[in-house]
């Protein structure tokens, strides 16, 4: 019985830790300016295992572009205080365009990742399975987006730059009065590693670990039952 308790404890620890982490497979940076002055750099850790198609598309646009057009020169065209900053329209630069390496649109991924803290990187869309080139970064917890948008990364450096973008003056349509422009983007070398965001609440901990732990617990209890039954007849 002691062995069973140890196995259950180890399984609980494993499922809890794995459920609350993301594997960062690559890091992309963007340098941003406003009113001809540098605002700073944002570094994104991308979740290539959770959202492989989305990460591949995002990296390709950053590094190679589509028909030669990358994110360089595009704007953060939508800025809403206490919500998000949005950019990446390499077609029209105003939020109306869409393109990707898969066509105009591609399917959703990683809809189970929740917007529990600022700094999550997600795909802007027009409804289910309408991802393209536009992306957003949350500046607050935004749970109302959960299940509706592909979340494929998180800011790991440069939230001060994100907040600086959030603070620029906008018009009544949430467009910055003076453009906020991506002047450079690229990739930072990294080996895949586990990233633990700072959004661990007790509820999130239970939600992440509960189902896999219960499943494992049931399997272990069934195994233990049959093991005892075998011992009774030996």
From Swiss-Prot:
SUPFAM superfamilies: Cyclophilin-like (SSF50891)
Subcellular localization, as worded in the UniProt entry: Membrane
Limits of the PPIase cyclophilin-type domain: 29-187
Domain of life: Eukaryota
GO biological process: protein folding; visual perception
Reactions catalysed: [protein]-peptidylproline (omega=180) = [protein]-peptidylproline (omega=0)
GO molecular function annotations of the record: cyclosporin A binding; peptidyl-prolyl cis-trans isomerase activity
Tissues where the protein occurs: Expressed specifically in photoreceptor cells.
Residues that span the membrane, as ranges: 202-222
Glycosylation sites: 67
Residues annotated as signal peptide: 1-19
GO cellular component terms, semicolon-separated: cytoplasm; intracellular membrane-bounded organelle; membrane
Alphabetized UniProt keyword annotations: Glycoprotein, Isomerase, Membrane, Rotamase, Sensory transduction, Signal, Transmembrane, Transmembrane helix, Vision
Main localization (coarse): membrane
Topology term for the membrane: Single-pass membrane protein
EC number, as in UniProt: 5.2.1.8
Disulphide-bridged cysteine pairs: none
Family that this chain belongs to: Belongs to the cyclophilin-type PPIase family.
Function text: PPIases accelerate the folding of proteins. It catalyzes the cis-trans isomerization of proline imidic peptide bonds in oligopeptides. Acts on the folding of rhodopsin RH1 and RH2 (but not RH3) and is required for visual transduction.
Protein name, UniProt field: Peptidyl-prolyl cis-trans isomerase, rhodopsin-specific isozyme
């Amino acid at each position: 019985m002691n062995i069973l308790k140890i196995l259950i404890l180890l399984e609980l620890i494993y499922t809890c830790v794995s459920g609350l982490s993301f594997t960062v497979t690559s890091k992309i940076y963007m340098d941003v300016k406003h009113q001809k002055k540098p605002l700073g750099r944002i570094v994104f850790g991308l979740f290539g295992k959770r959202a492989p198609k989305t990460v591949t598309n995002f990296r390709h646009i950053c590094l190679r572009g589509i028909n030669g057009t990358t994110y360089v020169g595009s704007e953060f065209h939508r800025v809403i205080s206490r919500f998000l900053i949005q950019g990446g329209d390499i077609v029209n630069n105003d939020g109306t365009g869409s393109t990707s390496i898969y066509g105009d649109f591609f399917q959703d991924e990683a809809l189970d990742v929740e917007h529990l803290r600022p700094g999550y990187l997600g795909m802007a869309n027009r409804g289910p399975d309408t991802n393209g080139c536009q992306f957003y970064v949350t500046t607050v917890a935004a749970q109302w987006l959960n299940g509706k948008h592909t979340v494929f990364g998180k800011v790991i450096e440069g939230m001060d730059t994100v907040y600086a973008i959030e603070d620029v003056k906008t018009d009544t349509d949430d467009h910055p009065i003076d453009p906020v422009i991506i002047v450079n983007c690229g990739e930072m070398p990294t080996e895949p590693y586990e990233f633990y965001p700072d959004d661990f609440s007790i509820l999130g901990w239970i939600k992440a670990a509960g189902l896999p732990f219960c499943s494992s617990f049931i399997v272990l209890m069934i195994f233990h039952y049959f093991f005892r039954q075998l011992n009774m007849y030996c």
